[in-house]
């Protein structure tokens, strides 16, 4: 059975991340995601991000852009990712890094694994896995 995603509306953009991350979302998680996007792609310049809830309990964000992103990762991966694949990759990097913080360790580790489960069905699975390896 495949994991389904749902784009969050304006109210859900507040309530869904709050249920998962609490008050840490607007102060630690969300800014970290944006910073990570800039680290992974020189052509990321900010902007609005869509937020998605997965029916397995996962959550991720992706830029609301029609332009793919050239990505250069710390592991040596270089390539171009669609907006959705870029968002998945950025969130996976952010969750991985934040899983080492005392307060967010359990939540971010869980979100990492839920998101990784979802990406295994993504059309760009091989590119994303290469980027996060």
Positions of predicted regions on the chain:
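Amphipathic, interaction-prone secondary-structure segments
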Residues: 25-68
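Terminal domain-start segments
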Residues: 1-38
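Short, charged/polar micro-motifs that form catalytic or ligand-binding hotspots
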Residues: 7, 38-41, 74-81
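Compositionally biased, low-complexity repeat tracts
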Residues: 18, 34, 53, 72-75, ...
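Feature targets compositionally biased, intrinsically disordered low-complexity regions
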Residues: 21, 56, 65, 75-78
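Polybasic, proline/glycine-rich intrinsically disordered low-complexity segments
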Residues: 68, 72-133
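Generic surface-pattern signal
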Residues: 22, 26, 38, 42, ...
């Amino acid at each position: 059975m495949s994991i389904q995603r749902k784009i969050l509306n304006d109210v859900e953009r507040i309530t869904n991340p709050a249920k998962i991350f609490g008050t840490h979302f607007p102060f630690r998680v969300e800014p970290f995601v944006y910073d990570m996007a800039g680290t992974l792609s020189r052509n990321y310049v900010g902007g609005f991000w869509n937020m998605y809830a997965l029916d397995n309990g996962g959550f991720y964000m992706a830029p609301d852009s029609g332009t793919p992103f050239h990505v250069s990762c710390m592991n040596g991966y270089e390539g171009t990712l669609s907006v959705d694949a870029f968002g998945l990759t950025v969130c996976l990097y952010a969750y991985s890094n934040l899983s080492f913080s005392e307060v967010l360790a359990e939540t971010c580790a869980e979100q990492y694994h839920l998101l990784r489960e979802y990406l295994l069905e993504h059309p760009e699975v091989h590119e994303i896995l290469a980027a996060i390896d």
